[in-house]
Regions:
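Bilobed "Venus flytrap"/periplasmic-binding protein-like clamshell domains
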Residues: 41-69, 73-74, 132-197, 309, ...
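Pocket-lining segment of extracytoplasmic ligand-binding domains
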Residues: 101-103, 110-114, 178-269
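Short, low-complexity disordered leader/linker segments with a strong preference
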Residues: 1-43, 333
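A bilobed periplasmic-binding-protein/Venus flytrap-type ligand-binding module shared by bacterial periplasmic
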Residues: 131-143, 236-241, 262-278
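Extracytoplasmic
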Residues: 41, 71, 81-84, 91, ...
Length: 333
């Protein structure tokens, strides 16, 4: 499956380049600049996330709706997640991509997971779509707090991924380090498989809830989510203000004993700066004028107010135009 998705991604990228052309370092400009052949206006590759995560599912729904109802054709593809998507935008291999709100800030400032890469500023914000909950998943009922993860086999996401840094932040809030656990570096689907097979004790999953991989796991195993208590959540947010508290309702997954308190980051759509203003305007307007037609539970959480609340990375001019029509001013380059 992964090999198939890789081949599809390579083919789509090749077709996109051939059809679109353009220099990704060209100026954003305004409506007049959009007429330039150097602006990409169609056949956009939307790099999402792993095939067991919410990025992949939501991205597919959005891509299909935009392609069907506008002149902009969008193809969603699986990817390695936030950091991989930003690198794909920068290289020109994708024109749209999902990112956690913390990871995009790391990229724009060249910090944390992007410390070795240096600052990447060739992308802009399109919309903050929904919150991604930090879900600490286990099938071991004896693991009740983050502190209980000490000495356990714990998947903390792919090395260098957004999930990895979220896990490190949360472990740190409880006085734990990576060395205090037996870390495993797995994506969502692989983590779910490892939990199912008893190869790991817990896994960090950062995605909109419900998440496909956890839902699937709960059909055959007793699944538990570990809460982050208010004291530790408040301390984490004071240190890392891009987190916010969130409650995962008990009915989100089969078998949960009650509501789960945790923290979350934003799920943000980004665009390469060389995508035309008109294309991004059409993309954004299609989402927010038709959220009731998007066949995914996360669509109910999407709002223009949330979409326009990012401050760490400026907005694409095409997105800014749409928000301005709704009476909201957002920062642009």
């Amino acid at each position: 499956m992964k090999k198939f998705l890789t081949l599809v991604l390579a083919l789509v990228m090749a077709l996109s380049r051939a059809a679109c052309g353009g220099d990704k370092n060209k100026d954003n400009g305004g409506t007049d600049a959009d007429a330039s052949a150097n602006k990409i206006s169609n056949n956009l590759v939307f790099s999402t996330g792993g095939d067991g995560g919410t990025y992949f599912a939501v991205g597919g729904v959005i891509a299909q709706h935009v392609s069907t109802n506008t002149d902009v054709k969008v193809t969603s593809v699986a990817s390695g997640g936030s950091k991989a998507n930003i690198l794909l935008l920068d290289s020109g291999d994708a024109q749209l991509g999902f990112s956690q709100s913390d990871v995009m800030a790391y990229a724009y400032n060249g910090t944390s997971t992007f410390a070795d890469d240096g600052a990447i500023t060739s992308f802009s914000t399109v919309a903050n779509l929904y919150l991604e909950a930090v879900q600490i998943v286990t099938c071991d009922a004896s693991i009740k707090t983050v502190a209980d993860l000490k000495g356990k086999n714990v998947s903390i996401g792919d090395a260098g991924s957004g999930v990895y840094f979220n896990a490190i932040d949360i472990l740190g809030a409880y006085g734990l380090t990576e060395q205090d656990i037996k870390p495993q570096y797995k994506g969502f689907s692989d983590s779910a498989d490892a939990l199912k097979d008893g190869k790991i004790d817990a896994a960090f999953v950062v995605a909109g809830a419900p998440t496909v991989s956890i839902t699937d796991l709960s059909t055959g195993k007793d699944v538990h989510l570990v809460s982050i208590d208010k004291e530790h959540a408040d301390a984490l947010i004071a240190k890392c203000p891009y987190y916010m508290t969130i409650t995962i309702p008990a009915d989100t997954y089969k078998g949960l004993d009650g509501d789960v308190q945790t923290v979350a980051v934003g799920a943000v759509v980004l665009a390469a700066d060389n995508v035309s203003d008109d294309a991004i305007y059409a993309f954004v307007s299609d989402i927010f004028e038709h959220t009731d037609e998007l066949s995914h539970a996360k669509a109910k959480e999407m709002s223009i107010e949330t979409a326009a609340n990012i401050t760490s990375v400026p907005y694409h001019p095409g997105a800014a135009r749409y928000y301005a029509e709704k009476g909201i001013t957002v920062p642009t380059k």
